[in-house]
């Protein structure tokens, strides 16, 4: 049973169809097609209620396509800025992804800050799993 889908259905929340298509392309490993699909949209007009998801998905795609870390971090940061007070997982997952990038770059203070930022957000989908990854990251870098 997909608990998130059930919760969204009970709230009458329906994601933007273009973002759903992009997610399916990404999940299927069609990263170039996903990038082309999401890049063809005017975000201000078409995505006003979905900024956090838009920036999160764009950053994930760019990460798979080996874009520059700086650009990926900027996109994840936009997701955090737009969704930090949302019940969606995009902002905390974006904070986690930024932390992992900084950890890989051995920027451990920045990584710790983003692991903590992730942990400071609550009441979102997949919270336990995302928080566990952030806690594990803190343990790794603080040892």
Where on the chain are the PLM-derived regions?
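Extracytoplasmic and endomembrane cell-envelope/extracellular-matrix remodeling and assembly machinery
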Residues: 1-41
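Structural motif corresponding to the intra-repeat A-B loop/turn of tetratricopeptide repeats
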Residues: 28, 65-67, 105
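Inter-repeat boundary and helix-capping residues of tandem alpha-helical solenoids
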Residues: 11, 18, 47-52, 69, ...
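Intrinsically disordered, low-complexity segments enriched in Gly and acidic/Ser/Thr residues
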Residues: 45-46, 50-57, 61-66, 70-86
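Solenoid-like repeat scaffolds
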Residues: 2-11, 39-49, 78-88, 117-125
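"A position-specific structural signal for the A-helix of alpha-solenoid helical repeats
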Residues: 16-20, 55-64, 90-100, 130-139
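Single-residue signature of alpha-solenoid repeat helices
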Residues: 34, 71-72, 111
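TPR/TPR-like (Sel1-like) alpha-helical repeat modules
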Residues: 1, 77-80, 96, 106-126, ...
């Amino acid at each position: 049973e997909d608990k998130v889908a059930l919760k969204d259905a009970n709230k009458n929340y329906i994601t933007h169809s273009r973002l759903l298509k992009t997610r399916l392309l990404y999940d299927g490993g069609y990263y170039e097609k996903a990038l082309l699909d999401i890049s063809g949209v005017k975000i201000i007009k078409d995505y006003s209620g979905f900024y956090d998801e838009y920036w999160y998905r764009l950053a994930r795609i760019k990460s798979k396509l080996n874009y520059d870390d700086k650009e990926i971090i900027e996109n994840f940061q936009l997701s955090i800025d737009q969704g930090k007070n949302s019940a969606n997982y995009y902002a905390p997952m974006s904070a986690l992804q930024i932390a992992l990038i900084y950890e890989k770059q051995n920027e451990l203070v920045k990584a710790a800050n983003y692991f903590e930022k992730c942990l400071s957000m609550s009441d979102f989908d997949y919270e336990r799993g995302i928080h566990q990854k952030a806690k594990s990251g803190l343990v790794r870098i603080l040892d």
